[in-house]
Amino acid sequence: MTLVGPHRDDLVIEQEGRVLRDVGSTGQLRTAAVSLKLAELATLREASGREPVLLLDDVFAELDRERQERLSVRLGAPGVRQVFLTAPRRDELPEGLALDVFEVRDGALRPAAVPV
């Protein structure tokens, strides 16, 4: 067990002077977490000069439609080249998602028959 290091630190995010963890909705907390992940992506890209792979598991869960659509646009933006995200059901993906969509059926990965 390690007793010191960045993994032992707490990060406090505030919104309008209040701690988001204490007052934020589930969607706001999820949005903050995704925002940190996108900032990490930009930092890694800048530091390495290469495009990192972005892995997001069930990222649209607990986000309202507006937040889903804004994130969808951000993920399809120029410069974001390698994004892998999962969703348990196809209807949980926002309409117009500008990414290639694949599905796993019978243990095989294949392009989705119907675009989102």
Segments from the language model and where they lie:
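Conserved NTPase motor "head" modules and their coupling/switch loops across ABC/AAA+ ATPases, GTPases
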Residues: M1-L55, E62-E66, R70-Q82, D91-D100, ...
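Conserved H-loop
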Residues: A87-R89
